[in-house]
Amino acid sequence: MATLEDGTSEDRVANDEYKIWKKNTPFLYDLVMTHALEWPSLSVQWLPDVAKDNSDHTIHRLILGTHTSDEQNHLLISKICMPTDDAQFDASRYDTERSEYGGFGAVNGKVEPDIRINHEGEVNRARYMPQKSNIIATKSPHADVYIFDYLKHSAVPRDNTFNPLIRLKGHTKEGYGLSWNPNKEGLILSASDDQTVCHWDINANQNVAGELQAKDVFKGHESVVEDVAWHVLHDGVFGSVGDDKKLLIWDVRTSTPGHCIDAHSAEVNCLAFNPYSEFILATGSADKTVALWDLRNLRMKLHSFESHRDEIFQVQWSPHNETILASSGTDKRLHVWDLSKIGEDQSAEDAEDGPPELLFIHGGHTAKISDFSWNPNEPWVVCSVSEDNILQVWQMADNIYNEVDEETPADVVERQQ
């Protein structure tokens, strides 16, 4: 059992690591912004639209949620101002107090709620429908999945009324996993602690109370289902993972899984299908590893990514680079991996920093990372949120992924372990 002293020591280490990270930020990043939210957000996702502000800035939007103590929770659509590619980056503009770099000043770096929607309980996860980004699904501490059209809500709620567009019924417990079908509008999957995956078509007729029963309920896991994801290229295929340490691959037309794999040595918390390759997917686990799989031969994992120091709760592929994958979790770190570097020769000194496929470690958080999202419009830009209310928008220095600058001092770009 952890003692108070252990916690204090852990906090001290985290604080020291953060100071080192902050000192090296101008050398490791082209862009960093740190913002303290009013309440922690367990979920984050960039919306796909971008608006032009002026010659040097564009306005992006984020889907966030709140996790309050006893106050009203909200689903948030927030806007953020970001410098354009042709904005002049100046190292002298780095703000050590705010840990901001890359053109963000005290005004430009604000994250401001644009629309605030009443939500029943904290927002465990929120994701927009790819075909209509104004339609957002959320998971909460309650069993139902909620659907909102944020265009039908004012900037600030008029009262405390909770008014989702649709309530999706079918689960008996809460959960986190949520996935919209990228190829068929309106189809959505949800994973739950009740050991099932539910499937709905939100275009189907709902009852007078605005409720819609699940089209299908998939039962194959023997414990909590942690995550679910549609295949990106095959519209009827999806995967699920759970606390039974298994990866299940399903066809939506069949009630039993086509594949059932013992994927990890501990609970499997997340999965993601590669958007470029129809055969490749990744899973993240409490065993501190990310596993790479080929659907053509699931008997053996292709590779195990090992560098995290604690449970992994989120894994996502870059929308711009086929070989780039990121993972995050309890160790307060977000790791960016490059599959093309697997098996490359390393010096003993480099090996101490991690395997060759470990491209970058984002060390800006001092608490568990709850969620992160790749920006769909700006390559290499990531937004990550942690349990201590912190939201960070960041982009690693281009010499790290372009390998242009061989002269950068090793002590400066040393990965934060």
From Swiss-Prot:
One GO location term (cellular component): NuRD complex
Transmembrane segments: none
Signal peptide: none
Keyword terms, alphabetized: Centromere, Chromatin regulator, Chromosome, Developmental protein, Nucleus, Repeat, Repressor, Transcription, Transcription regulation, WD repeat
Domain of life: Eukaryota
One Pfam family named in its UniProt record: WD40
Subcellular location: Nucleus; Chromosome, Centromere
Function: Core histone-binding subunit that may target chromatin assembly factors, chromatin remodeling factors and histone deacetylases to their histone substrates in a manner that is regulated by nucleosomal DNA. Required for hcp-3 and his-1 stabilization, localization of hcp-3 to centromeres and for proper chromosome segregation. Synthetic multivulva class B (synMuvB) protein. SynMuvB proteins are required to repress the induction of vulval development by Ras signaling and probably act by forming the multiprotein DRM complex that represses transcription.
Entry protein name: Probable histone-binding protein lin-53
Organism: Caenorhabditis elegans
Lineage: Eukaryota, Metazoa, Ecdysozoa, Nematoda, Chromadorea
